[in-house]
Protein backbone atom coordinates (compact mmCIF):
# COMPACT_ATOMS: atom_id res chain seq x y z
CA UNK A 1 0.00 0.00 0.00
CA UNK A 2 2.72 2.42 1.01
CA UNK A 3 4.75 1.65 -2.12
CA UNK A 4 1.71 2.11 -4.36
CA UNK A 5 0.92 5.55 -2.88
CA UNK A 6 4.56 6.60 -3.21
CA UNK A 7 4.68 5.55 -6.88
CA UNK A 8 1.47 7.40 -7.72
CA UNK A 9 2.55 10.57 -5.92
CA UNK A 10 6.02 10.62 -7.47
CA UNK A 11 4.54 10.42 -10.96
CA UNK A 12 2.38 13.50 -10.32
CA UNK A 13 4.84 15.96 -8.77
CA UNK A 14 7.75 18.06 -10.03
CA UNK A 15 9.99 17.21 -7.04
CA UNK A 16 9.72 13.41 -6.62
CA UNK A 17 12.65 13.40 -4.17
CA UNK A 18 10.55 15.29 -1.61
CA UNK A 19 7.70 12.76 -1.58
CA UNK A 20 7.45 10.98 1.77
CA UNK A 21 4.90 8.38 2.81
CA UNK A 22 4.61 7.28 6.42
CA UNK A 23 2.40 4.49 7.67
CA UNK A 24 0.57 4.52 11.00
CA UNK A 25 -1.05 1.21 11.87
CA UNK A 26 -4.10 1.30 14.13
CA UNK A 27 -6.29 -1.45 15.52
CA UNK A 28 -8.73 -1.52 12.62
CA UNK A 29 -7.14 0.62 9.94
CA UNK A 30 -3.93 1.89 8.41
CA UNK A 31 -3.30 5.61 7.97
CA UNK A 32 -0.97 6.60 5.13
CA UNK A 33 0.40 10.13 5.45
CA UNK A 34 1.59 11.66 2.19
CA UNK A 35 3.98 14.60 2.41
CA UNK A 36 4.99 16.52 -0.71
CA UNK A 37 6.79 19.79 -1.40
CA UNK A 38 4.54 22.85 -0.84
CA UNK A 39 4.70 23.81 -4.52
CA UNK A 40 3.48 20.33 -5.50
CA UNK A 41 0.51 20.31 -3.13
CA UNK A 42 -1.86 21.62 -5.81
CA UNK A 43 -0.84 18.90 -8.24
CA UNK A 44 -1.56 16.15 -5.73
CA UNK A 45 -4.92 17.62 -4.66
CA UNK A 46 -6.13 18.73 -8.10
CA UNK A 47 -9.10 20.92 -9.00
CA UNK A 48 -11.79 20.55 -6.33
CA UNK A 49 -9.83 17.61 -4.88
CA UNK A 50 -10.41 15.34 -7.86
CA UNK A 51 -6.89 13.89 -8.00
CA UNK A 52 -6.79 13.39 -4.22
CA UNK A 53 -10.13 11.58 -4.40
CA UNK A 54 -8.86 9.38 -7.25
CA UNK A 55 -5.71 8.51 -5.28
CA UNK A 56 -7.81 7.57 -2.24
CA UNK A 57 -10.10 5.43 -4.41
CA UNK A 58 -7.19 3.48 -5.90
CA UNK A 59 -5.61 2.91 -2.49
CA UNK A 60 -8.94 1.80 -0.98
CA UNK A 61 -9.47 -0.64 -3.85
CA UNK A 62 -6.04 -2.15 -3.23
CA UNK A 63 -6.78 -2.34 0.51
CA UNK A 64 -10.05 -4.21 -0.03
CA UNK A 65 -8.06 -6.93 -1.76
CA UNK A 66 -6.11 -7.43 1.47
CA UNK A 67 -9.18 -7.02 3.72
CA UNK A 68 -7.84 -3.83 5.30
CA UNK A 69 -9.15 -0.31 5.76
CA UNK A 70 -6.78 2.43 4.63
CA UNK A 71 -7.07 6.19 5.07
CA UNK A 72 -4.89 8.53 2.99
CA UNK A 73 -4.02 11.90 4.51
CA UNK A 74 -2.24 14.54 2.45
CA UNK A 75 -0.05 16.71 4.65
From Swiss-Prot:
Gene Ontology CC: one annotated term: cytoplasm
Pfam families: KH_KhpA-B (PF13083)
Main subcellular location: cytoplasm
MF term (GO), any: RNA binding
Subcellular location: Cytoplasm
Domain KH: 29-75
GO biological process, one term: cell wall organization
Protein keywords: Cell shape, Cell wall biogenesis/degradation, Chaperone, Cytoplasm, RNA-binding
Family listed: Belongs to the KhpA RNA-binding protein family.
Oligomeric and partner information: Forms a complex with KhpB.
Role summary: A probable RNA chaperone. Forms a complex with KhpB which binds to cellular RNA and controls its expression. Plays a role in peptidoglycan (PG) homeostasis and cell length regulation.
Protein name per UniProt: RNA-binding protein KhpA
Lineage: Bacteria, Bacillati, Bacillota, Clostridia, Eubacteriales
Amino acid sequence: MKQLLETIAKSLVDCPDEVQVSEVTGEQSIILELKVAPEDMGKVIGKQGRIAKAIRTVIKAAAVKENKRVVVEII
